[in-house]
């Protein structure tokens, strides 16, 4: 066996470079972070050939003393920390003193730097970790670092680099994330001698997010801000329809540092769980500020990952803040349908009408406006369907008796199930007092939460949300209510067809009803309304299922199932959620129990969502089921009152719109 020996410094630096310098993007990241730590207000990044040929960073920061410039090329030489206490409370992006020597060990490296009050600057040239030249030079205040021929002396690493465009994409991602984290700094990226990004210093993180993500994305983003004794979380999330195919749209920053934390990402996805399809990702920008003592950034070679002292509290805060922000999305229409907007002919409609005139299929003049567009509700239809009008259909039954709190024990039972829909099952109107950050209810004797209560910065949120509403026009009168549109009929007893002013709307009846029931179970303040059973149902379970049910009784209570032990392995059901009032209690409880067991190791809020999904799917009308006109109307009215009418709880689309232009293209009309 060979004797143990100490490796030479050059080899040590090349080994260290394998951890720190994974690819050109890692070089760009380390150099940009050094510029930010130096207090630069303007930073320029230039690359060539995806960073393999050249990476150059120029800043107007504090610069370095000549002695410090040479010392910075030694391993573990840094100005950021002096003691273990400094490491535990680190606030800078860099602190290990590994980046510059590691980069210089695998490239042809040049450093030019000057302090603001120095007469001359310092030039240092390094090749493969060996200092070749040191001299004075003229230069502006700040630092310029040039890295050429990356991995020229490590062929095994160089051959595994991807194509230039791919490496450029990685660099752009790092550049955008650091630019997003430090909005006041002017960032510029030059690729192949052409400016690819130029982000002037912004007044706020939201303004910088608009520069990076684009103005259209910013218009469809919902801001939020929450704060507690130990942390502050602010940011924005895109509306559910703003989906992406990958997770590159998730931007998470902890104390100004871009990080990739699986738990935080899962919390973001959990907040959108019932709003976007599985495999899709939302747009989210999160800025988390907390005591440096509560987060460890020294757990990954590239400082990409962090470890939280209280991960559960962070995850709950992230999910709750996003979910609360999404719940402030108003329904397109309130409990009473909004008055339709006056009709004005759109460009698509004019083009469609003109094509018919040209082909002799329409007799009116081109310049003559339509008195009422095809498919728009007539005055008679509107009057007949006013929210306060008498029901036009004699078969429409009254809502089943519901209670929240419970109905009187002597009340008469609900009417037989003549209709598939119950107006009492509609979601409750927005309640500004709903607090998604309140301490969860716990059973008597259960452990109290150890996390400090979270308070919402209502003033900041209100200002931001008013701006958001003004930009996105989420007001009730902006879109005609679905219930006010003429119903063409059902297609294959599965899809409801509506005639819109500018086209055709197809609605998946099962997905729409699922969304209505899910929101009724999930979002009303105080929990969903309950329907008390005239005759309590007794359920006998196998011992294993009985033990599991005892564990999940508080969760079943939260979604509206009132159930208690009846001795041994028997249970008695006294009430069920009003939207599920016609479901057999035994079958409902067994199905909910199976869903809870399937998510046994999931967080409490995840299991609650799973239970609500199961209940909604169990109760919703099926594809292929014929609906009466009054049932279709009730479904459309419920959809108008729903916050997230565009998707079902599983993230599938509820409706699809074909404009007149889409139809014209199908028939090759121009």
Swiss-Prot record:
Question: Which GO terms label this protein's molecular function in UniProt?
Answer: ATP binding; ATP hydrolysis activity; ATP-dependent DNA damage sensor activity; mismatched DNA binding
Question: Which portions of the sequence form the region Disordered?
Answer: 363-451
| Basic and acidic residues bias locations | 379-389
Presence of the UniProt keyword Ribonucleoprotein in the record: no
Database matches in Gene3D superfamilies:
3.30.230.10, Histidine kinase-like ATPase, C-terminal domain, MutL, C-terminal domain, dimerisation subdomain, MutL, C-terminal domain, regulatory subdomain
For this protein, the parts annotated as crossing the membrane are none
Q: Which InterPro entries does the annotation name?
A: DNA_mismatch_repair_CS, DNA_mismatch_repair_MutL, DNA_mismatch_S5_2-like, HATPase_C_sf, MutL/Mlh/PMS, MutL/Mlh/Pms-like, MutL_C, MutL_C_dimsub
- One Gene Ontology CC term in the entry: mismatch repair complex
Family (UniProt)? Belongs to the DNA mismatch repair MutL/HexB family.
- Protein function: This protein is involved in the repair of mismatches in DNA. It is required for dam-dependent methyl-directed DNA mismatch repair. May act as a 'molecular matchmaker', a protein that promotes the formation of a stable complex between two or more DNA-binding proteins in an ATP-dependent manner without itself being part of a final effector complex.
Q: Which HAMAP family match?
A: DNA_mis_repair
Please identify the protein, giving its name as recorded.
DNA mismatch repair protein MutL
The organism's lineage? Bacteria, Pseudomonadati, Thermodesulfobacteriota, Syntrophobacteria, Syntrophobacterales
Q: Which gene encodes it?
A: mutL
């Amino acid at each position: 066996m060979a004797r143990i020996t100490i490796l030479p410094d050059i080899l040590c630096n090349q080994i260290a470079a394998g951890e720190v310098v994974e690819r050109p993007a890692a070089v760009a990241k380390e150099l940009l972070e050094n510029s930010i730590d130096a207090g630069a207000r303007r930073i320029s990044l230039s690359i060539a050939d995806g960073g393999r040929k050249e990476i150059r960073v120029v800043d107007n920061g504090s610069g370095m003393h000549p002695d410090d410039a040479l010392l910075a090329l030694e391993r573990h030489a840094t100005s950021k920390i002096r003691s273990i206490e400094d490491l535990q409370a680190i606030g800078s992006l860099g602190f290990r003193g590994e980046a510059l020597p590691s980069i210089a060990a695998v490239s042809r490296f040049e450093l030019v730097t000057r302090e603001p009050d120095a007469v001359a600057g310092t030039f240092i040239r390094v090749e493969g970790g060996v200092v070749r030249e040191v001299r004075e030079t003229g230069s502006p205040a700040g630092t310029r670092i040039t890295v050429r021929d990356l991995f020229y002396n490590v062929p095994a690493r160089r051959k595994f680099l991807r194509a230039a465009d791919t490496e450029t994409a990685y660099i752009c991602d790092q550049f955008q994330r650091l630019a997003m984290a430090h909005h006041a700094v002017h960032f510029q990226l030059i690729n192949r001698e052409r400016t690819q990004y130029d982000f002037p210093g912004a007044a706020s993180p939201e303004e910088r997010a608009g520069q990076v993500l684009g103005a259209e994305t910013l218009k469809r983003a919902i801001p939020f801000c929450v704060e507690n004794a130990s942390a502050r979380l602010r940011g924005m999330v895109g509306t559910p329809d703003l989906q992406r195919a990958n997770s590159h749209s998730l931007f998470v920053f902890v104390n100004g540092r871009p990080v990739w934390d699986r738990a935080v990402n899962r919390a973001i996805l959990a907040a959108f769980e019932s709003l976007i399809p599985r495999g899709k990702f939302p747009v989210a920008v999160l800025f988390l500020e907390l005591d440096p003592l509560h987060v460890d950034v020294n757990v990954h070679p590239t400082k990409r990952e962090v470890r939280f002292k209280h991960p559960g509290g962070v995850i709950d805060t992230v999910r709750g803040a996003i979910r609360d922000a999404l719940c402030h999305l108003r329904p397109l229409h309130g409990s009473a349908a909004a008055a339709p907007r006056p009709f004005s002919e759109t460009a698509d409609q004019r083009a469609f009408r003109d094509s018919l005139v040209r082909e002799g299929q329409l007799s009116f003049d081109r310049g003559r406006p339509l008195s009422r567009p095809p498919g728009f509700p007539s005055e008679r239809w509107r009057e007949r369907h006013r929210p306060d009008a008498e029901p036009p259909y004699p078969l429409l039954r009254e809502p089943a008796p519901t209670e929240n709190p419970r109905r009187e024990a002597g009340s008469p039972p609900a009417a037989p199930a003549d209709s598939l829909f119950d107006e009492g099952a509609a979601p409750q109107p927005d309640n500004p007092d709903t607090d998604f950050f309140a301490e969860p209810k716990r059973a008597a004797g259960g452990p109290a939460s150890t996390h400090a209560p979270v308070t919402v910065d209502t003033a900041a949120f209100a200002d931001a949300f008013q701006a958001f509403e003004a930009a996105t026009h989420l007001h009730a009168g902006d879109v005609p209510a679905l219930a006010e549109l003429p119903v063409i009929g059902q297609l294959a007893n599965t899809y409801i067809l509506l005639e819109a002013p500018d086209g055709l709307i197809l609605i998946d009846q099962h997905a729409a009803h699922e969304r209505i029931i899910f929101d009724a179970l999930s979002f009303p303040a105080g929990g969903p309304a309950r329907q008390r059973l005239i005759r309590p149902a007794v359920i006998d379970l196998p011992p294993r299922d009985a033990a599991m049910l005892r564990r999940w009784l508080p969760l079943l209570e939260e979604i509206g199932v009132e159930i208690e032990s009846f001795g041994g392995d028997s249970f008695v059901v006294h009430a069920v959620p009003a939207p599920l009032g016609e479901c057999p209690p035994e079958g409902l409880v067994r199905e909910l129990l199976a869903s809870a067991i399937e998510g046994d190791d999931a967080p409490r809020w995840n299991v609650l969502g799973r239970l609500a999904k199961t209940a909604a799917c169990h109760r919703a009308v099926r594809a292929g089921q014929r609906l009466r006109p009054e049932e279709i109307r009730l479904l459309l009215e419920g959809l108008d009152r729903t916050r997230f009418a565009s998707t079902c709880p599983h993230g599938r689309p509820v409706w699809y719109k074909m404009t007149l232009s889409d139809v014209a293209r199908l028939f090759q009309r121009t």
